[in-house]
Regions:
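Short amphipathic alpha-helices and their capping/turn segments at secondary-structure boundaries
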Residues: 82-96
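Conserved catalytic cores of phosphodiester-cleaving nucleases, focusing on short active-site segments
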Residues: 84, 101-112
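C-terminal tail/extension regions appended to the core domain(s) of diverse proteins
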Residues: 1-29, 39-50, 72, 118-122, ...
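Residue-level detector of short, conserved catalytic/binding motifs and their immediate flanks
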Residues: 80-82, 103, 146
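Mg2+/Mn2+-dependent nuclease catalytic core
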Residues: 110-135
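A short acidic/basic microdomain associated with nuclease active sites
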Residues: 42-77, 83-85
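Eukaryotic short linear interaction motifs
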Residues: 93, 112-114, 156-159
């Protein structure tokens, strides 16, 4: 419980730091990388303050699930890669094989869909929360809690929560509830208790930290789909630029083409007449 509390505190501060950056990338993986750097900075500052809020173990970024003592041979879950995991040694654990535990954190974007097939608020459930209950993914195995981070890029929080919970119910998962100390400026904490039939221990407490990043990406009227289209525009411009350069290199303007040809022709005639007139 103490490790969870410290991890959540560090990530809450790191998300605030992320939100205050002058610019941010749009894509999930790039946001995760920025958040990783923020979390390390926050943890370093807390360790220097020496108030017992920092964590001396290393935060792991995009690392595979570690082997679990209950798995006698290598399993599929060991090939899965959570966004973050923060290990610790549970000294209260009687079994030395089970003393090493990992707090797993998965991150997803939240808001309106970027396309008809990529729906963020559904993806948060299907490719996020479910990884903590699906044995093939096995996130949080042998741990009592884990976390999800949501990057809000547009839409209001209440509308997002309704859509996420609608998708959770359709996947036979419990609702996410606003935590008692949930709403802070730009950061919202929510809680969810999962029953895990095929992963121990159960029940499992999944914490949710949602950060409001809308101010980084858009005018109030723009959707995620419009943002995605704008992000792709520079690539089209570069393509045009390359085409133009190719055109300039391979097909000079007509006047430039005609002049060298006339000059070359005269040059050849001159040489011929010089050869005929010693």
């Amino acid at each position: 419980a103490n490790h969870e509390k410290r991890v959540l505190n560090i990530f809450t501060l790191a998300l605030k730091m992320l939100s205050e950056k002058p610019t941010l990338p749009l894509e999930e993986n790039n946001l995760n990388r920025e958040l990783y750097l923020c979390a390390n900075r926050v943890n370093g500052m807390l360790l220097k303050e020496n108030r017992g809020q920092g964590i001396e173990s290393t935060l792991m970024y995009e690392s595979k699930n570690q082997p679990d003592p209950d798995d006698k041979t290598r399993t599929k879950r060991e090939d899965k890669i959570p966004d973050f995991q923060w290990g610790f040694c549970d000294c209260k654990e009687a079994d030395p094989d089970r003393m090493t535990k990992y707090f797993i954190i998965e991150s997803k974007r939240l808001g309106s869909p970027s396309s008809s097939t990529w729906i963020f608020n559904k993806n948060y459930v299907v490719n996020g929360i479910k990884r903590f209950v699906d044995p093939e993914w096995g996130y949080g195995k042998s741990s009592h809690s884990g976390a999800m981070i949501g990057y809000i890029q547009d839409m209001e929080l209440q509308n997002i929560l309704e859509e996420v919970n609608t998708n959770a119910v359709s996947e036979l998962l419990p609702d996410i509830q606003l935590s008692s100390d949930g709403e802070q400026p730009d950061i919202t904490r929510l809680d969810q208790r999962l029953e895990r039939e095929q992963i121990q221990p159960t029940p499992f407490d999944l914490r949710h930290l949602w950060v409001d990043l809308k101010h980084h990406y858009q005018d109030k009227d723009k959707t995620n789909q419009q943002i995605e289209e704008e992000v792709s525009k520079p690539k089209q411009t570069n393509k045009k630029s390359r085409t133009t350069n190719k055109s300039k290199g391979g097909e000079p303007p007509e006047e430039e083409v005609s002049k060298p040809k006339q000059t070359n022709k005269k040059s050849r005639n001159t040489k011929k007449s010089k050869a005929g007139e010693p």
